[in-house]
Amino acid sequence: MLLHWVLAIALIAIFGLGLYMTGLPFSPQRLKLYNWHKWAGVTILALSVLRLVWRITHRPPALPLAMERAMPVWQKAAHHATHHLLYVLFFAVPLIGWAYSSAAGFPIVFLGVWQLPDFVPVSKELAEAIKPWHELSAYAMAGLVVVHVAAALKHQTIDRDGLLQRMLPGKR
C-alpha cells in the first residue's frame, strides 16, 4: 500500500512539474526543473518495477462477497482495464521520456551523478516524433488517475461500501 501512495504523490508531482516547466522561458531554472523531472521519472520507473513485482507476488485482497455481487459487470471491467492501463503507463511514460531525452541529445544524469545510457540514437527527427507520445501518454495517465480517484470517491459517497477505507494507509 505504501508504494501505491508514494507513486500517487510522485505522479501528481511530476505531472504538475511537467506542466509548469514546459511553460517557462529557456533559462537555467527551466533546465534545472527538466533535470528534476527526469530524476523523478527514473524514480517512478524504479518504483513501478517494485510495484509490479509486489503485485505479482502479493495478490490484492478479494472484494467482500456482497460488494462483488453488487458491482455491475461494466464496473468490474472498467476497474480491471483502468488498473492494467495504469501499469502499462507507469512504464511507458518514463521510458518514452527517456527515449525522447536520448534522441534530443540530453542525457539523463540521475541525481547529477549517474549517467543513464541512451537507448536510442541522437536524432532531431526522432526526438520530434517521440515528444508528443510522451506528452500524450502522460495526459492519458493523468486522465486514468482522475478516473481512479473518481471511482474511489463514488464508492465512498454514493455506494458507501467501504472500498475507500481499504485503500487508506493503516485501514486493512
Task: Pin down the residues of each PLM region.
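Membrane-embedded alpha-helical bundles that constitute the cytochrome b-like, heme-associated redox core
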Residues: M1-R172
